[in-house]
Amino acid sequence: MLTYETWEENVVSFSEEDETKGALSVLNWAYEEYKDEIVYACSFGVEGMVLLHLINQVNPSAKVVFLDTNVHFQETYELIQRVRERFPSLNIIEKQPELTLDEQAKLHGEKLWESNPNLCCKIRKILPLEKSLVVEKAWISGLRREQSETRKHTKFINQDHRFQSIKVCPLIHWTWKEVWRYVYKHSLPYNPLHDVGYPSIGCEKCTLPVGDGGDSRDGRWAGKMKTECGLHYQ
């Protein structure tokens, strides 16, 4: 088994000639390699809808973890319910932070997402995922190279130094148009905020719509010199 400790570069290769640009091949390998010791960390963005559909074909009882920061958009919570109905056999786990919002405010002040967004992300996203991955050998992410400058070198299989794990990224070669083409082709549910200028959707407190021609992550932590929550350490 390929693990963080036994990491070898390019130990496995995948054909990218099929309709999914290698995504199904990657997922088949991942679930064969890690069995029940792999989890998909899903934010329920549009890429997530594609991956959930593909994962359901490969492993209908796969584990999916959603990092519930308690400050997501209502539309996101409603989408999760629709996904549960569409893919009832998937094991969707909503992981909560150790601190409630009130406890966080008492310790670090009100609106930590404004005063110290990095700490807020650590408490409400990074630490919960870290705890989830303690019992896993690998995790799946919907990163695409096209999304941002910080993601353009992502590979199918990555040695993840942030969580000392293996990070599997099946959609690295997909374009934004290809993601949406797949969603429409398979009539997949998606967050309606995508239709009103939100290409990337995170917490309600830190996500704004993006103007025409903007980077897909420009609406995340706008004005904070920050475009990543910290889950995807480079």
From Swiss-Prot:
The note describing how and how many cofactors are bound reads: Binds 1 [4Fe-4S] cluster per subunit.
Q: What's this protein's family per the entry? A: Belongs to the PAPS reductase family. CysH subfamily.
Q: Where is the active site?
A: C229 (nucleophile)
Please give the GO cellular component terms listed in this UniProt entry: cytoplasm
| Record-linked NCBIfam families | APS_reductase, cysH, PRK02090.1
Subcellular location(s) per record: Cytoplasm
Q: What is this protein called?
A: Adenosine 5'-phosphosulfate reductase
Work out whether the entry's keyword set contains Repeat.
no
GO BP annotations listed? cysteine biosynthetic process; hydrogen sulfide biosynthetic process; sulfate assimilation, phosphoadenylyl sulfate reduction by phosphoadenylyl-sulfate reductase (thioredoxin)
Provide the alphabetized UniProt keywords: Cytoplasm, Iron, Iron-sulfur, Metal-binding, Oxidoreductase
Reported EC number(s) for this entry are 1.8.4.10
Where [4Fe-4S] cluster is bound, by residue?
C120, C121, C203, C206
Which cofactors does this gene product need?
A: [4Fe-4S] cluster
Q: Sorted alphabetically, which Pfam families does this protein's record hold?
A: PAPS_reduct (PF01507)
Q: In which pathway does it act?
A: Sulfur metabolism; hydrogen sulfide biosynthesis; sulfite from sulfate
